[in-house]
């Protein structure tokens, strides 16, 4: 099953997440099909907190990809920010 989920990066105590489309059988930070954005929960000042390619997300959801709970919330927030 294909899922859209967070892959953790960054240093210890300084998380940074890539939003990726991956096969659910692969490891959290392992092989992925496509990177569709990023989420930086510790962004300060003018730094971007969230960047998401909504066209690609909609494409993957239309082809049957499931989203994790956190990614579904981030997609909702991104759509609200665009509108």
Swiss-Prot record:
Coiled-coil annotation reads: none
Which superkingdom heads the taxonomic lineage of this protein's source? Answer: Bacteria
For molecular function, the Gene Ontology terms on record are:
structural constituent of ribosome
The record's section on NCBIfam families has: S16
Q: Which InterPro entries match?
A: Ribosomal_bS16, Ribosomal_bS16_CS, Ribosomal_bS16_dom_sf
- GO cellular component terms, semicolon-separated: cytoplasm; small ribosomal subunit
Q: What is this protein called?
A: Small ribosomal subunit protein bS16
Q: Which SUPFAM superfamilies match?
A: Ribosomal protein S16
Q: Which UniProt keywords apply?
A: Ribonucleoprotein, Ribosomal protein
Q: Which organism is it from?
A: Shewanella frigidimarina (strain NCIMB 400)
HAMAP family, sorted:
Ribosomal_bS16
Give the family from UniProt. Answer: Belongs to the bacterial ribosomal protein bS16 family.
Q: What PANTHER family has UniProt attached to this entry? A: 30S RIBOSOMAL PROTEIN S16, SMALL RIBOSOMAL SUBUNIT PROTEIN BS16M
Look up the record and give one Gene Ontology term from the biological process aspect: translation
